[in-house]
UniProtKB/Swiss-Prot annotation:
PANTHER family xrefs: C2H2-TYPE DOMAIN-CONTAINING PROTEIN-RELATED, KRUEPPEL-LIKE TRANSCRIPTION FACTOR
Domain KRAB: from-to ranges: 8-79
Function: May be involved in transcriptional regulation.
PROSITE patterns tied to this protein: KRAB, ZINC_FINGER_C2H2_1, ZINC_FINGER_C2H2_2
The keyword DNA-binding is assigned to this record: yes
Gene Ontology terms describing biological process: regulation of transcription by RNA polymerase II
Record-given protein name: Zinc finger protein 888
Disulfide-bonded cysteines: none
Residue(s) of cross-link: Glycyl lysine isopeptide (Lys-Gly) (interchain with G-Cter in SUMO2): K204
UniProt zinc finger (C2H2-type) residues: 214-236, 242-264, 270-292, 298-320, 326-348, 354-376, 382-404, 410-432, 438-460, 466-488, 494-516, 522-544, 550-572, 578-600, 606-628, 634-656, 662-684, 690-712
GO cellular component: nucleus
Organism listed in the record: Homo sapiens (Human)
Chief localization: nucleus
């Protein structure tokens, strides 16, 4: 049967772009190009699935010089030569769509099709595809980048003048200059009667008249492809027909569900050839690969900065535009990235989805968890190039580097103070503004830093996460642990520039420096007394208020200072953590150890200005001064008798109470004063520590020695 000779060409509905025009298209326009191509492709395939056809495909890689072949589809009513494998075609349509989406996500150029027409005969077809086998057209690895063009044509020798003219006209177009998205379809009028009822003819007529037959009433947007219309409709209607059977999450596209499922299966099919790292998305692999190549193809037109990811460039551009389109519904704070908004939202919800497998501690950010893990692993990836000191956090390294450079680039506009870090400047500014946005839910106390609130919260919870490996003592603050460790190591990093004396704490150095300067900047408004440190002034003020808010749980005794309660608590526990390296004697407080140490050194740094007498303990000097001033600040409430020492008052009060707390272990005799017990104990031991320098006679009590020395005419001892 002779094939009809009449032809119809669709050249007039072609959508063509030059290379320069193509680069100007935005992603949405390129996606439209893809959808039009696919619609044409499917419509042509669906014309007559039972008909015999032949197809050839190959493509050109972007920037390569491979020969371009055009896929051809031939109706051969009288030739039963091989059958088109339409399932293969549909499979490749799906592969093309998926790969396009991967490339778009990856930031690659969208696929483009370059056209070159071929004419052929059934003889040529017979030679290439003899054997009546299904055609397995070879698409190759580059099919994802280029969709082949389809032609339906009649066998050579039966083509009319119109067909030859159409082909000649088409071949005159420069394929190196044009990129075409069109079905160059040549069909006889007889076949065309059926064809005019297809969606392809409708699409051709719509494009030719610049009309769009699919319009969405919600947005007013029109489309010339039903597939585009359906996709757009899904976005507005919020329809998500693809559901994950594991977690129930819904998606509006099947490919999104396929990507999501890999989260549950752990599948990571894309592997890096360089380092072996695997990824669940091809886009992630491509992005990772740029780390090896150093490629940064995305450039900011404003400042020239380049990026390896398109998303990073888009985020960067908001710096120039100042755009922050993502707003928090809770507090109104705006962000330039949706991820930042999502992260911020956890502040309101309290969500902490990232949990440490070692200690079960939870975090609101993945970066916080990774940073925390280094505590368990001991990893310190940030190393100083000057002194090789390593740090867990990059911020800690940045702080440390300032020691070497002494650079403090961040300056406060209010007071001119400079800082090595911008975060430190921001915290400092709250001093001027008085802003304290962080409030404790337990007691209502407010803080200017979140870290201070977190630290304060441990007072309510009793949490002490920092433990000393030497003595197992625990602390609520890391700085307290580091300070405590110096007791074991003997480290004294704070050195006086005047006398080279070293100290474990910077506060102790500050106290010591006043000895040289004599400065006491902190003054009490009640009594006018001045102090070296603000903490000392705060402690002093309690004397005027009489407040004793620190109570011992063991005996109920109250104290006006927390440190005093801590010292007192050691009476119950028997703890004496401070040991003398000379004689091994242990003490409850560090000050007691320091005083004791002067017995070995003979140091007496405290001198009376009246009589030049020297003392090894400051409190002894203050007590001695009362000899000159006659001051007796401690008064008995019963008989109004006054004393120069609080210990004397305590002893005296036992006269009224009859209390004798000091008991001899040998004979059970009790005494009001500890000194009386000590003197009595020598009766049992026979010890006589007080010896006369004139005659060598020894005595149990110092008072007895003084009385004896009067015989020799020696004056009383001071």
């Amino acid at each position: 049967m002779a094939l009809p000779q009449g032809l119809l060409t669709f050249r007039d509905v072609a959508i063509e772009f030059s290379q320069e025009e193509w680069k100007c298209l935005d992603p949405a326009q390129r996606t439209l190009y893809r959808d039009v191509m696919l619609e044409n492709y499917r419509n042509l395939v669906s014309l007559d699935i039972s008909s015999k056809c032949m197809m050839e495909f190959s493509s050109i890689g972007k920037g390569n010089t491979e020969v371009i072949h055009t896929g051809t589809l031939q109706r051969l009513a009288s030739h039963h030569i091989g059958e088109c494998c339409f399932q293969e075609i549909e499979k490749d349509i799906h592969d093309f769509v998926f790969q396009w989406q991967e490339d778009e996500t990856n930031g690659h150029e969208a696929p483009m099709t370059e056209i070159k027409e071929l004419t052929g005969s059934t003889d040529q077809y017979d030679q290439r595809h003899a054997g009546n086998k299904p055609i397995k057209y070879q698409l190759g690895s580059s099919f994802h980048s280029h969709l082949p063009e389809l032609h339906i044509f009649q066998p050579e020798g039966k083509i009319g003048n119109q067909l030859e003219k159409s082909i000649n006209n088409a071949s005159s177009v420069s394929t190196s200059q044009r990129i075409s998205c069109r079905p160059k379809t040549h069909i006889s009028n007889n076949y065309g009667n059926n064809f005019f009822h297809s969606s392809l003819l409708t699409q051709k007529q719509d494009v030719h008249r610049k009309e769009k037959s699919f319009q969405f009433n919600e947005s007013g947007k029109s489309f010339n492809c039903s597939s585009l219309f359906k996709k757009h409709q899904i976005i507005h209607l919020g329809e998500k027909q693809y559901k994950c059977d594991v977690c129930g999450k819904d998606f509006n596209q099947k490919r999104y569900l396929a990507h999501h499922r890999r989260c549950h299966t752990g599948e990571k099919p894309y592997m890096c050839n360089k380092c072996g790292k695997v990824f669940n998305k091809k886009a992630y692999l491509a992005r990772h690969y740029r780390r090896h190549t150093g490629e940064k193809p995305y450039k900011c037109n404003e400042c020239g900065k380049t990026f390896s990811d398109k998303s990073a460039l888009l985020v960067h551009k908001t710096i120039h535009t100042g755009e922050k389109p993502y707003k928090c519904n809770e507090c109104g704070k705006v962000f330039n990235q949706q991820s930042n908004l999502a992260r911020h939202h956890r502040v309101h919800t309290g969500e902490k989805p990232y949990q440490c497998k070692e200690c079960d501690k939870v975090f609101s950010r993945k970066s916080y968890l990774e940073r925390h893990r280094r505590i368990h692993t001991g990893e310190k990836p940030y190393k100083c190039k000057v002194c090789d000191k390593a740090f867990r956090h990059d911020s800690h390294l940045a702080q440390h580097i300032v020691i070497h450079t002494r650079e403090k680039p961040y300056k406060c506009n209010e007071c001119g103070k400079t800082f090595g870090e911008n975060s430190a400047l921001l915290v400092h500014k709250t001093i001027h503004t008085g802003e304290k946005p962080y409030k404790c839910n337990e007691c209502g106390k407010v803080f200017n830093q979140q870290s201070n609130l977190a630290r304060h919260h441990r007072l309510h919870t009793g949490e002490k996460p920092y433990k000393c490996k030497e003595c197992d003592k625990v602390f609520s603050r890391k700085s307290h642990l580091e300070r405590h460790r110096r007791i074991h190591t003997g480290e004294k990093p704070y050195k006086c520039k005047v006398c080279d004396k070293a100290f474990r704490r910077d506060s102790h150095l500050a106290q010591h420096t006043v000895i040289h300067t004599g400065e006491k900047p902190y003054k009490c408004n009640e009594c006018g007394k001045t102090f070296v440190q603000n903490s000392s002034l705060v402690m002093h003020k309690v004397i005027h208020t009489g407040e004793k808010r620190y109570k011992c749980n063991e005996c109920g005794k109250s104290f006006n200072h927390k440190s005093s309660l801590a010292y007192h608590h050691r009476l119950h526990t028997g703890e004496k953590p401070y040991k003398c390296n000379e004689c091994g004697k242990v003490f409850r407080t560090q000050s007691q150890l320091a005083c004791h140490h002067r017995l070995h050194t003979g140091e007496k740094p405290y001198k009376c200005e009246e009589c030049d007498k020297v003392f090894n303990i400051k409190s002894h000097l203050e007590i001695h001064r009362r000899v000159h001033t006659g001051e007796k600040p401690y008064k008995c409430r019963v008989c109004d008798k006054a004393f120069g020492r609080d210990s004397y008052l305590a002893q005296h009060q036992r006269v009224h109470t009859g209390e004798k707390p000091y008991k001899c272990k040998v004979c059970d005799k009790a005494f009001k004063c500890y000194s009386h017990l000590a003197q009595h104990t020598r009766i049992h031991t026979g010890e006589k520590p007080f010896k006369c320098s004139e005659c060598g006679k020894a005595f149990r009590a110092q008072s007895t020695l003084i009385h004896h020395q009067a015989i020799h005419g020696v004056g009383k001892l001071d």
